[in-house]
Amino acid sequence: MPMQTTRRDLLTRSAAAAAVAALPPLRTAFSQTTPADEGPGATDLQRDLEEAIARHRVVGASAAVYHRGEIETATAGILNATTGVDVTPETVMHIGSITKTLNTTLVMQLVDEGLVDLDAPVLDYLPDFAVADPEATRAIKVGMLLNHTSGIDGEMIPDHGPDQEAIRKAVERARDLGQLFAPGEDCSYCNTAMVVAGHVAERVLGDSWYSLIEDRVFGRLGLQHSVVQPQDALLHRASVGHFLDPATGTQQRTSQAFLPLSFAPAGSTAMMSAPDLLAFVAAHLRGGEGLNGERLLSEESSKAMRTGTAAVQGIGAVRSFGLGFMLGPNDDFGHGGGGPGILSWFSAHEESDFAMVVLTNSAHGGLVAFELVNAWMKKASGFEPLAPQRFPALDIDIDARLYAGVYEDVAAEHTITERDGRLSVSSRAKVAFYDTTSTDPTPAFPLDPVGEHSFVVSLPEAIAATAPQTLLSFVNPQDDGRMRHVSTGGRLYLRRSG
């Protein structure tokens, strides 16, 4: 499986690449398969977690494993570098874009109840909905919001201040957003689409999205350590994000607790304990039935969420999306989540009746999450869902004319240039979402071909030795042969010039 997962391949590779690091987290990942052994009980979760956060210098983490009805939990580190308070199993931590799976579950409940049709236009439920293109406005269907095929150029938008951060306000602002492609034509991870889906639920049921998640998801599953309203975090043992200063080696607490609140359905506010999130994931493993015996949604709808509906173009990206979930090649499913100084992940496999959640409060916490998920899934299922595949550079001729140009979306820009027959890429974020995000362009990193129309970013050796590869695939040739999009990290960026 992500995005970036989660968001930010080039961006998280070095301080120089911080511009792209602000993008939502999807992780380039592949799967490696070996025979399964007797199960994850052969490994000590507490030991693994403690060793991993020490090795990768992560402030704090919470992990939970479900396997054939048995649950194990572990915590390590502290929830706030300023206070020094320990992480416990009850600690609520940011889940970021994992929220999209909660949001999709809510919409699928409405499908179960006959209140929403995935094949119906969004306009049927939101008559005032609009994007910049009138034809796209009419063509976007509810299901496209959930599997990232709407084409909306809506990665993220700036914070408009507390008075303007209602969910409905973000939907109103969508009327200024263009299209990366026509609705249903392709697939590109989209935050705004998920916000629109959450607003559909609000309008259909006449209640706030926050209350609906609390009642219909947390309430049905009996979750006691989960919040979606930011102020409710004060009622819990709550974690906060951190960034590791590469110059000093010190942990810097984030200056912002949440991303723009109007993007709550996409992942800006939700916080959960690892055991609570595991209970939600386990409900999907059990065909929509919670561990408490309550039904979260129908077996049909739960299965639909885990069934592929949209393929991602290019190599080294998310393979495909179901509805809400990211899908791997071994019938595994999962999702990542990023935010201000946090990175979290879960993976699950129905055949093995296995799921694992790892929540961290460090921007580079994916190093811990991916390491543990790979090790424990391999024990239970015989494969590593997040094991990166490394592509060797190929000595092949390229036609630079096909690729050179500026590719962008509303949040980031990638400039591809050619010199002496070799391509390079420089990226920049358009909005400084995090403390460490710079809106200055990164240095130009060389691109080495690894396949037809696909390239690997050639990073400094010290970074490349340990970091996953950042891969760019140029897709959708135009009439003149030049590529219309570049695909990376589960996202498409549209050629604007060149």
Feature-to-residue mapping (PLM):
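Peripheral terminal and inter-domain segments
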Residues: 329-330, 370-498
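N-terminal export signals
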Residues: 2-4, 9-31
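Short, conserved catalytic-motif segment at the N-terminal edge
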Residues: 36-95, 115-117, 124, 130-132, ...
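A short acidic/small-residue loop/turn micro-motif
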Residues: 78-81, 363-364, 491
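Short, surface-exposed loop or secondary-structure junction motifs
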Residues: 67-76, 80-81, 133-346
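Catalytic tyrosine of NAD(P)H-dependent dehydrogenase/reductases that use a Tyr as the general acid/base
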Residues: 93-96, 187-189
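Short, well-ordered beta-strand elements
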Residues: 345-362, 487
